[in-house]
């Protein structure tokens, strides 16, 4: 197993890089891929840049160049669930795109043309490992598993936040 860990911004991956035993660095598409070990686990950590296109390109490079078996996206996110506080941890059970809408082509909001799914399910074993690990290292925080909504915009209005949630 080799895990690719993506963060959009440098502060989201800096601590991971500091904790790694680095074997090599590699640059492609203006991204620096840092390969090595985190504990005893082979990982590749990378700052992708903000946005779903950057994350998708980064993921493909991780698969093609580094043969990662799993991809984890880590970082800061907006807060829509009123039961959560800043700093709480959400492990995704599935992912939806809140800004994908091709309704005029007879697709449901969030559905990508050509795909039969509305949401992308996370790996059950990774969810369980992440929940256990997060609760061990941050017992003072609320740790939950739930749906994550992604979009290429900052949600700054309560109306949009309510619509997404």
Please give the residue ranges for each predicted region.
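Short, conserved "active-site rim" segments that organize catalytic pockets and cofactor/ligand binding
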Residues: 1-20
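Glycine-rich phosphate- or other oxyanion-binding loops that anchor nucleotides, phosphorylated ligands
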Residues: 2, 26-165
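Short glycine-aromatic motifs
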Residues: 19-27
């Amino acid at each position: 197993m080799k895990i690719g860990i993506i963060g959009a911004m440098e502060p989201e991956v800096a601590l991971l890089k500091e904790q790694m035993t680095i074997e090599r660095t590699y640059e492609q598409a203006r991204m620096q891929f840092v390969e090595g070990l985190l504990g005893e686990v082979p990982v590749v950590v990378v700052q992708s840049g903000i946005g779903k296109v950057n994350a998708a390109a980064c993921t493909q490079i991780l698969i093609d160049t580094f043969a990662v078996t799993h991809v984890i996206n880590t970082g800061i996110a907006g807060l829509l669930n009123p039961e959560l506080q800043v700093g709480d941890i959400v492990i995704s059970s599935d992912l939806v795109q809140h800004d994908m809408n091709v309704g005029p082509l007879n697709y449901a909001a969030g559905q990508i043309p050509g795909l039969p799914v509305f949401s992308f399910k996370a790996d059950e074993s990774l969810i369980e490992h992440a929940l256990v690990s997060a609760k061990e290292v941050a017992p003072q925080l609320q740790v939950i598993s739930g749906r994550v909504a992604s979009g290429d915009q900052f949600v700054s209005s309560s109306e949009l936040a309510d619509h997404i949630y």
